[in-house]
C-alpha cells in the first residue's frame, strides 16, 4: 500500500491511497467466504460454496463490491496510522480506481486536530480573587437561616412588604378570564414579584376583606398586551423571625451556642469560596491559553453542532407550543443573535478540546481505573442517575470513548493547573489544594466524529 497526505487546511487533510491487487487478495478471499455464508446453492452446505460457483451464480462483481467495502476502512486506517494525525470526523471517501486485477485507488478527506504549540505552563501566571469571609457574610447566612425558621402570625392591619397574604385573584383580557388566570386561597409574599406585574403595589395597604383592581402587563403568548386583574385579600400574616441566640443555634443546628454556629458558617462559606476560586483559576487558565494561541476549528464540525443545537431548541420550543423565535423573544434575544452566540460557544468548546487533547497526547496522560470511576460518579450525580445506570447508558450508546476522552481532558486541565503559578489580586501565592472541582465540570463536550 502507498499513501500520501495533502494538507488542505490546518484542520483538514486529504489522503490518496493506492493498494495493489495482490494486497487485496486476503480481503477478496474473506469476501468470498462472507458471500458463501449468504447464498444457498443445491448440493453445497452454507459457507462451502466454491468461488467459481459463486462467480457463475451471482457474479464476481458482488464479491468485489464486498471486498471493496471491507478494504477501504482497513487501508484508510493504515494510512491514518502512518501519517500520525488525529482525525476528528468521518472521512469523505471517493474511489478513483477499482477494477478486477488492477488494484484500488481512493481518496479520503477528513477533519483533523490542528497542531498546537503549547507554552511551558511554568511560564504562566493566573490571577484569581482572594478568599475572604467577612462578618457581614456570616450575618447574611445567619439571617437567611433564621428566615427559614420564621413563623407567620395573623395581624389586623394593612399589608406591607414582607407580609404573607392569602389571596383570591382573577386576570381578564378583553373581559375574558385567561387560562390559568384564576387563583383561589393562595399564600403570597408581598414584594416577591412572583405572580403578575403590578400585584405587589396593589396589595400594599389592603387589609383582610379588601379588594383592588390593577393593570397587569402580560408576557409569553400575550407579550405586549395588558390585562385587568382583581385581587381580594383574605388574611394578612406577619413573618416573625426568631432571635439570634444560643436557643436558636440549638433549634436550627447541631451546635449549642450561637458562636459555634457562626464559626461553622464561616468555615462553610470559606470552603465554598475556595471551590469557586479553583473554578475561577481553571477558567482563567483556559482563557489565558486561548488568548495566546491561534487554534483553528473545522467549519464542518462547527456547522453540524450549530444545526444540532438549533434543532434541540426547536423541539424544546415546540413542546411548549411556541417556535424558537418566540421563545427567544421572551428572553430578550433575537434568533440571529442566539445563533451567533451558539456558534461562538461551539467554536470555543472545540478550541478547548483541541488544547486539552494536545496536552493529553504530549504528556501521554492515561486514566487510572479509580479516576474513571470518580468521573462516572460525578457525571451520574449531575444527571440525577445512578453510576451503574449511567455506565450502562454509555455502553448502550457506544459513547464510552467519548466519556474517557472527556475525563482525560479534565485530567489534562488539572495537570496544567498544578504547573502554573497562581496568585490572588494582592500578589500572594494561592494554594489550590482542597478546592478541587470534578473533572466532569471543566468544559462541555462537542461530539467531533
Swiss-Prot record:
Pfam families: FKBP_C (PF00254), Trigger_C (PF05698), Trigger_N (PF05697). Residues 428-449 are annotated as: Disordered. GO terms for cellular component: cytoplasm. Its main location: cytoplasm. GO terms for molecular function: peptidyl-prolyl cis-trans isomerase activity; protein folding chaperone; ribosome binding. Residues 438-449 have a biased composition (Low complexity). It is found in: Cytoplasm. It comes from the Bacteria. SUPFAM superfamilies: FKBP-like, Triger factor/SurA peptide-binding domain-like, Trigger factor ribosome-binding domain. Residues 162-242 form the PPIase FKBP-type domain. Keywords: Cell cycle, Cell division, Chaperone, Cytoplasm, Isomerase, Rotamase. NCBIfam families: tig (TIGR00115). Belongs to the FKBP-type PPIase family. Tig subfamily. Involved in protein export. Acts as a chaperone by maintaining the newly synthesized protein in an open conformation. Functions as a peptidyl-prolyl cis-trans isomerase. This is Trigger factor. It comes from Acidothermus cellulolyticus (strain ATCC 43068 / DSM 8971 / 11B).
